[in-house]
Amino acid sequence: MKNNILRGKILRLLSDMYPNGIERTSLNGIYHAYDNIEDIERSVEYLCDKGYCEKTETPHPYKEGLKVIYYKITPKGIDLIDGNAEADSGILIPLEA
């Protein structure tokens, strides 16, 4: 899958989950059949860097030293999904995740 399509699918998924987010391993599990983990993680980091989603790290509840990473769409990301913001050529928004 092209990166701009994958980014759009991830952003649509985050929009569908709003106001909650998704844990990184769950996100990877959803899309790993279509893309490799590196492309998925690069795509979600791109979305974070552009301000369309935010990344939160919390300590793992059972494994000392490990962190659990969550992603959540931002208001800027919701505006992009809803068509209330200027289109971003790096993200192709699908009708559904």
Language model feature labels by segment:
Residues M1-M17:
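Short alpha-helical segments that sit at the start of domains
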Residues T58-P59:
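Solvent-exposed edge beta-strands and adjacent loop segments
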Residues K67-A97:
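Short, amphipathic alpha-helical interaction segments positioned at domain boundaries
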